[in-house]
Amino acid sequence: MLLSLLIIIPFLSSFFSFFSPRLHNNFPRWIALSGIIATLLVVIQIFFQENYHIFQIRHYPNWNCQLIVPWISRFGIEFNIALDGLSIIMLIFSSFLSIIAIICSWNEIKKNEGFFYFNFMLVFTGIIGVFISCDLFLFFCFWEIMLIPMYFLIALWSDKTEKKKNFLAANKFFLYSQTSGLILLSSILLLVFSHYYSTNILTFNYNLLINKPINIYVEYIVMIGFFLSFAIKMPIVPFHGWLPDIHSRSLSCGSVEIIGVLLKTAPYALLRYNLVLFPDSTKSFSLIAVFWGIISIFYGAWIAFSQTNIKRLIAYSSVSHMGLILIGIYSNNERALQGVVIQMLSNSLTVAALCILSGQIYKRFKTQDMSKMGGLWSCIYWIPGFSLFFSLANLGVPGTGNFIGEFLILSGVFEVFPLVSILATIGIVFSSIYSLNVIQKIFYGPCKQNIKVFFINKQEVWTIIALVFTLVFLGLNPQKIIDVSYNSIHNIQKEFNNSILKIRS
């Protein structure tokens, strides 16, 4: 019952938010915030109640906390949701960042609040569903349910001065996402029907599709389909074109939800599906994937350095870091996979904070152009110090979760692909160039605008402080995350290796 609440609570909250303005204008934000907090409390309750991370060692993938309800039985489709250590970590951090996004929207959203929070909670519902789905058809439904509400969030609640560009950015996101969804659906159907022809069992059940051999050529085609679908959403080069546009147009709350939460569904899906369902083809594709990741690291860093728009710079920075995550996923090394988990969480926190800080600067100066800024260190309290901290975290300074994630990934990759690890390390050095360049352009030098000294409000300060403490906690005590996710990651790696041995024997 508790597991079903993870879907029911945010889904109902979206409709309550939509109709609640008839009672009071402030009700939608409170309903949305309460819905996310309630979802987080349910996750925490399951965390302490189930001991799933102990159970998983010997019973993978038969989840201890699982709900299976017949749905479209004729086609083998079930409402099948479950939790393990990896998914529960993603749920906790997604809920936390969604709460941060709601707080950011508190003073930004003044019109059509009911419709805004309706769309926001539908996106949150889709994200939760992606992390807990164990049926491929259900996974696809949640993957796609985020598309339409995300389109409205981008088109209707972005930069008010250039509405035409808002719709162009939203249309670009829609086209990329539709392409991703079409490729994913085609690949799922090809996998399911290939399994049916081999076993005479029609099913979309993740557990039943594991370790069931299909034709190697079909497996490779399906694996490529899954990979391309997830690569578009990560995104990695050359599928990144939609991200800078929508990020530069979105409000702070939208940016936090898109880059901080939404983008992390794709690397999660690569871990959960590609490594386990397509082990042999993934193994043969791994060298291509890691060099693809190298290209993304260097390209994202170079383009970030050339940007004058601060929010586009943050978007390209995210593309660069996604390249590192891609390398870790395809390294076939358990330590690197643990680093991927830490890096996903740390990058989400860092980018969310930078989005919020850049949003505060834009709110006061009405520009995202760094060439029009300068000398702001003496004009703004709190923001320069926080910006310096998160810029240093973004380049992987020790004491932050980013350093732990990068260290684990690079050390794990070095055991398998030494040259790739060295190239990735060189690429990461470029992040220090654009990160420090941002600080220099915005906060140092002569002041280019006549502005008065001002403070940011308490709400903004406490939001950033929460992100600082969480990021430092990951950097100083990553063992907590590793312990919870260890058995999930260990078993994903074990299933990957065992499947290869079975196929080759």
From Swiss-Prot:
Q: Does the keyword Transmembrane helix apply?
A: yes
The alphabetical list of record keywords is: Cell membrane, Membrane, NAD, Quinone, Translocase, Transmembrane, Transmembrane helix
Q: Do you know which InterPro entries this protein is assigned to?
A: NADH_Q_OxRdtase_chainM/4 (IPR010227), NADH_UbQ_OxRdtase (IPR003918), ND/Mrp_TM (IPR001750)
What Gene Ontology terms for biological process does this UniProt record contain?
A: ATP synthesis coupled electron transport; electron transport coupled proton transport
Q: What is its EC number?
A: 7.1.1.-
Q: Does the keyword Membrane apply?
A: yes
Judging by the UniProt lineage, the source's domain of life is Bacteria
**Cell compartments where the protein resides:** Cell membrane
What the entry lists under Pfam families is as follows: Proton_antipo_M
Provide the Gene Ontology terms for cellular component: plasma membrane
- Task performed by this protein: NDH-1 shuttles electrons from NADH, via FMN and iron-sulfur (Fe-S) centers, to quinones in the respiratory chain. Couples the redox reaction to proton translocation (for every two electrons transferred, four hydrogen ions are translocated across the cytoplasmic membrane), and thus conserves the redox energy in a proton gradient.
Kindly provide the name given to this protein in its UniProt entry: NADH-quinone oxidoreductase subunit M
Record organism: Buchnera aphidicola subsp. Acyrthosiphon pisum (strain APS)
Gene that codes for this?
A: nuoM
